[in-house]
Amino acid sequence: MNTYIPEGYKSLLGVYDTQKAIGLLKRLFEDQLAAKLNLFRVSAPLFLEEASGLNDNLNGYERPVLFDIPQAGKEAQVVQSLAKWKRMALHRYDFYPGKGLYTDMNAIRRDEDVLDNLHSVYVDQWDWEKIIESSDRNLDYLKSTVMDIVAAVCDTQRTMRAIYPQLQVLPELERQVTFVTAQELEDRYPDLTPKER
């Protein structure tokens, strides 16, 4: 495992306050995001019945963690991705255009290629999905959604900085978003690969 801690790093909060702050940050951000995007919290499954077909295999080679449930006579898989499950949940909960869900997924990805500060076998990830009208499938709606997400992040940071003055030393996030299309990047950097751009 390749973890990296920058030289001279010192935590701004003690261990207890760090855990307390993480919990608060999650609650604040959930509330901000839900309000700005009209989302409702839905609990995500930890595992799914193998036969349901709702567990994504992500990139095609990752193997889910499997186990049997003898009392039910079923095979189950630890969730790897909620992409299919979220769409099923939108239908099951009778969501309508303009309304969506968010969830906190916990997963085990046993075939993770690289283990480091950002990649782990254990995944704790927020996810959201929203039903939109066909007329909303456009660049303006996408940009507006991005701006709402950035506002949720910035509003959360502002509150955290007010509650924990020690965080004032960190740079304040910018609300202004610069949008760049893939075509603009290709025009500007034609000799670079898409990944390098």
Regions found by a protein language model. Name each.
Residues 2-119, 127-131:
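Class II aminoacyl-tRNA synthetase-like tRNA-binding/catalytic domains
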Residues 32, 145, 188:
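Residues that form generic nucleotide/phosphate-binding pockets
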Residues 81, 134, 138, 180-181:
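General structural signal for secondary-structure boundaries
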Residues 122-162:
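Long, contiguous amphipathic alpha-helices that act as assembly "spine/axial" helices in icosahedral shell
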Residues 148-197:
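Metal-assisted phosphate- and nucleotidyl-transfer catalytic regions
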